[in-house]
Amino acid sequence: MARKTPIEKVRNIGIAAHIDAGKTTTTERILYYTGISHKIGEVHEGAATMDWMDQEKERGITITSAATTCFWKDHQINIIDTPGHVDFTIEVERSMRVLDGAVAVFCAVGGVQPQSETVWRQANKYHVPRIVFVNKMDRIGADFYNVENQIRERLKANPVPIQIPIGAEDNFRGVVDLVEMKGIVWDDETMGAKYEVIDIPEELREKAEEYREKLVEAVAETDEELLDKYLGGEELTTEEIKKGIKKGTLDMTITPMLCGSAFKNKGVQTLLDAVVDYLPAPTEVSWIKGIDPKTGEEVSVESTDNGPFAALAFKIMTDPFVGQLSFIRVYRGQIASGSYVLNSTKEKKERVGRLLKMHANKREEIKELPAGEIGAVVGLKYTLTGDTLCDESHPVILEKMEFPEPVISVAVEPKTKADQEKMATALAKLAEEDPSFRVHTDEETGQTIISGMGELHLEIIVDRMKREFKVDAEVGQPQVAYRETIKAPVDQEYKYAKQSGGRGQYGHVFIKLEPQEPGKGYEFVNNITGGVIPKEYIPAVDKGIQEAMQNGVLAGYPVVDIKATLYDGSYHDVDSSEMAFKIAGSMAFKEAAKKANPILLEPIMKVEVEVPEEYMGDVIGDINRRRGQVQSMEDRAGNKIVTAMVPLAEMFGYSTDLRSFTQGRGTYSMEFDHYEEVPKNVADEIIKKRNG
């Protein structure tokens, strides 16, 4: 079957933004102008097409990334919706993996917000070229040039406006296109569907000339030929300027800036033109890397229809009508409904049921999905987020996604005994969809513990259990994911010998425990020489140590960042076994850890609080009371921004407290930053409580 859209004309883009920058509204307008949704959904009233889960409608924030397809100027644009709340950075990372380019939306009033910095860093990490859309130009306090400065200073990027606004706040009418040097004003009567091209207004002429010059200079620097021409005093043609903007965008030396007001229907068509003109096709980004599972060698996967099939599953969702949907991005070859593919990550064969393309929340059934495309597969049994699907005869494993460890846990129990099983099923399904969410049973209390990236993250999980799986759950007090580690190196011998009639047990080890740098994790070194412990027992010692690390010696929290070296020991021909050495390893670790100056670690959150100046003193006083350390203070749009490192344990219920002492005018965001030693007086309390 021939492709409907040649791969050069496909754009896979994400629209990334801070919570209130107006991302969903922008996406809605794109869908409106590209002719798919004829009625514009307003987030304020909770009817946006992209936000299709109930809670998103209520909270007005976008949670799951749905992939939507639309068309503009004979190009196909696949939009991956990315959430803007910091508890969902995992979703953002996940969508960054499969995008080729992004539109970063900033609010013309609020500018660069803390979350935008996180998202920007993630886009840098995955080398995602992006263009900037400064939204909400109609709002009081809108300042395009201020946002330009913030992008330069805070995000360390090189923003190059390719438009400047005509008017601002209530007088915002349109933009000056610096490439064509024309004005564009939108017609309010037709909801912005009509616009007219005008000469640049007299009062903006000088500013337009100044910014045109900056644009041409930035473009000239992307290419030797253009630079020679520019330095020789020649004019660059419109074509050359466009070519230069695209080149600079793709190699991320420049970030084109546009502006508008999605809500007032201004600037959306020019944004779509920029997506088509300046963001890359799948063939214009670097080939994705993979591993050949047979040899372990690195291979490159080219974006082309001709070649063995290879795709990445980036999102699993449960759909009430068709069951489990696996959203995939095809990198090479194509996939057909009814065919068989290999899940190389799990080494399982999968049958492809139906293939769907999503248009906001309508679905279209398709027969094939070619390279560079994004769609959903129905009927996969084993595939989870981050798995690779490929041709059985050409296995490849595409890059793995890295998921952060959860930092907060709560105990959940169903309100009725009858719901116990339903709850277990619901949680298992939700954990399949979201790798940053974990479920386990506490061995001592038998309680079900759920862990995630923040309070909001867990609230939404509990909420989804209720809505989608009809399970009402009681939620306990949030618990912090403490860890333990050691500060001093220790040598330890342990001999496990049991003689009680019949076959005995014998394992004898000498280990050295040493602290590692924070975040380095666990390392096991085998320094046994001369066969004092036979090879086959070495992994058992390692396993014993790792099992003992699950419950630390201070308060039973997992132990992190240690290096264990096995350097001596002895064995018995008859009585030694894997079991005996596992016990010896485990006991040696426990004994050593007690002497190695064990300490408790707690997650420290990077907290950003934005408040009017008069509440600044209260905020800082409160942060100090919470054992926090203020890192910096700055001004943003007439408010004060306080950045601080605060232990997660002290942050519970912060939103309520902040609301009360700022009369609801303070906002904050927080994300996990690192683990740090708990002060002794606090640690003693925690240990006493845990050990009862």
From Swiss-Prot:
PROSITE patterns in UniProt: G_TR_1, G_TR_2
Protein family according to the UniProt entry: Belongs to the TRAFAC class translation factor GTPase superfamily. Classic translation factor GTPase family. EF-G/EF-2 subfamily.
Major location (coarse): cytoplasm
GO cellular component labels: cytoplasm
GO biological process: ribosome disassembly
Keywords of the record: Cytoplasm, Elongation factor, GTP-binding, Nucleotide-binding, Protein biosynthesis
InterPro entries noted in UniProt: EF-G-like_DII (IPR053905), EFG_II (IPR041095), EFG_III (IPR009022), EFG_III/V (IPR035647), EFG_IV (IPR047872), EFG_V (IPR035649), EFG_V-like (IPR000640), G_TR_CS (IPR031157)
Gene name tied to this protein: fusA
Role of this protein: Catalyzes the GTP-dependent ribosomal translocation step during translation elongation. During this step, the ribosome changes from the pre-translocational (PRE) to the post-translocational (POST) state as the newly formed A-site-bound peptidyl-tRNA and P-site-bound deacylated tRNA move to the P and E sites, respectively. Catalyzes the coordinated movement of the two tRNA molecules, the mRNA and conformational changes in the ribosome.
The protein, known as: Elongation factor G
Source species of the chain: Nitratiruptor sp. (strain SB155-2)
